[in-house]
């Protein structure tokens, strides 16, 4: 999972104005970096120009995803990432950056601003922090921990069962479980199996 670009733009009529941008092109060869950066700027402007105000979208181009968020006040943000990067985290980042940007930069500067004139320094920090979505986004971190717990629990149950043994057989042979508990287990098992897609 990788973030390549984080941009803040103003959706003018008809052109989008780049206000500030941060790039991570370290994964590209030295001779490609400036061209890749220019292409990302061009793509970001084009996507904002073609998106409506108050909209969010994800545009796929080969193995890259461009996430765009254009607010109703014409302030827009674009994240360019690989296709594995979670879109929910990308939109969380865009919302956070645009809120922060709108508080630090006067609205009258948006239509006439440029990367040289806009005084906002948060993009590089956000780009590096959000490279690992699990660390940057609490929900992703919790989801990853839940997935790991599921794997551990699944492996633990399998390791408790001996070769060829099934949990169903153990439940039916059990002397500790009462008939009501066995009936509950069988009912739960049937309900879970009827809903499985085969």
From Swiss-Prot:
Protein name, entry field: Synaptobrevin homolog YKT6
KW tRNA processing (keyword) present: no
Predominant subcellular localization, coarse grouping: cytoplasm
UniProt GO MF annotations: protein-cysteine S-palmitoyltransferase activity; SNAP receptor activity
Alphabetical list of CDD domains matching this protein: Longin, R-SNARE_YKT6
Keyword vocabulary terms for this entry: Coiled coil, Cytoplasm, Cytoplasmic vesicle, ER-Golgi transport, Golgi apparatus, Lipoprotein, Membrane, Methylation, Palmitate, Phosphoprotein, Prenylation, Protein transport, Transferase, Transport
Membrane topology, record value: Lipid-anchor
């Amino acid at each position: 999972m990788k973030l390549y670009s984080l941009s803040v733009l103003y959706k003018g009529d008809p052109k989008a104005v780049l206000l500030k941008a941060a790039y991570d092109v370290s994964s590209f060869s030295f001779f490609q970096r400036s061209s890749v950066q220019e292409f990302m700027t061009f793509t970001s402007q084009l996507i904002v120009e073609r998106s409506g105000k108050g909209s969010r979208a994800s545009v796929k181009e080969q193995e890259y995803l461009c996430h765009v968020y254009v607010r109703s006040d014409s302030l827009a943000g674009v994240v360019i990432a690989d296709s594995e990067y979670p879109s929910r985290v990308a939109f969380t980042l865009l919302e956070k950056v645009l809120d922060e940007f709108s508080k630090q930069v006067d609205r009258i500067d948006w239509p006439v601003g440029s990367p040289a004139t806009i005084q906002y320094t948060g993009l590089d920090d956000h780009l590096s922090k959000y490279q690992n979505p699990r660390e940057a986004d609490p929900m992703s971190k919790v989801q990853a921990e839940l997935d790991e717990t599921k794997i551990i629990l699944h492996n633990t149950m399998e390791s408790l069962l001996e070769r060829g043994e099934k949990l169903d057989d153990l439940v039916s042979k059990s002397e500790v479980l009462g008939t009501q508990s066995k009936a509950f287990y069988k009912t739960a098992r049937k309900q879970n199996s009827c809903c499985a897609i085969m």
